[in-house]
Amino acid sequence: MESASREDYLRGMYHLMEEEGSVRSVDLADYLNITKPSVSEMLHELNREGLVQYKKYSRLKFTSKGHEIAKKLTFKHRIIESFLKDVLKILDHYISIYKD
């Protein structure tokens, strides 16, 4: 993946926090398959926008606003994924191809 949107970063952070409990920028870079400098740049932007708390070499945290947005985005994404699987009977393999 060449680039990712703010939505991708927020959903990725949310997912990793659900799975691991905490997230480092390197974890997010690996998860999104993006370079660490690109992740750092976007995290600085998200920090300026008041969505995440980002300090170099420390764990990432959502602000309450960022957490709420990430939660809603993740919920919407999961609803769509469930619809594709359960109603349209699209196989997981095909969903994963177009997931992001």
What are these regions (language model features)?
Residues N47-K55:
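A short, conserved structural fragment
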Residues R78-D100:
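Amphipathic alpha-helical dimerization/coiled-coil segments
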Residues E2-I34:
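N-terminal helix-turn-helix DNA-binding core of bacterial DNA-binding proteins
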Residues L43-H44:
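Short, hydrophobic-biased segments on the C-terminal half of alpha helices
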Residues P37:
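Key DNA-contact positions within bacterial/archaeal DNA-binding proteins
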Residues S58-H77:
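Basic, amphipathic "hinge/linker" alpha-helix immediately C-terminal to the N-terminal HTH DNA-binding motif
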